[in-house]
Amino acid sequence: MKPSGLETPMQQAVAITHTGYYKVGEMTQGLGWESYHYPVSLDKLLAGNSTQMAMEAHEVQWLTPSQPQPESVLINKTGSTGGFGAYVAYVPSKDIGIVILANKNYPNPERIKIAHTILSALAK
C-alpha cells in the first residue's frame, strides 16, 4: 500500500501507476488503477465501477500535468478472467485494504458493497 519500503525503481513504478492522468466524474484514472478522494461514498464507488462507466463514452477532464495521488485516497480496480472475478481496494493513509476473489457470476456491485462495508469498519 505504501511503496516507501521498496527499492527506488519499484517506488517509481508504483508512483507512475498511481498517478492521475484524467478524471471522469469523481474517479481519477491512473495506469490501470482508479482512485477517489477518501472517504468516498458507496454510491460514488458504484457509479465509478458500473457497467455504464466501463462500456459507454464519457467526457474526460485531462490532468495536465498529470497529478500524484492526494494523501487521502481510495485506490481500486475490478477485473475478471475465466470463471473468476476480483475487486481490490485500499486506502494507503489508513493502512487498510481488501482483495475479494469470487466466482465471476458474483456481480461487481456486490463485491464493491461488501468491500466498502469492510473498509468502513476497518477505518474506525
Pin down the residues of each PLM region.
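Catalytic loop of the DD-peptidase/beta-lactamase superfamily, centered on the K-T-G motif
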Residues: 1-124
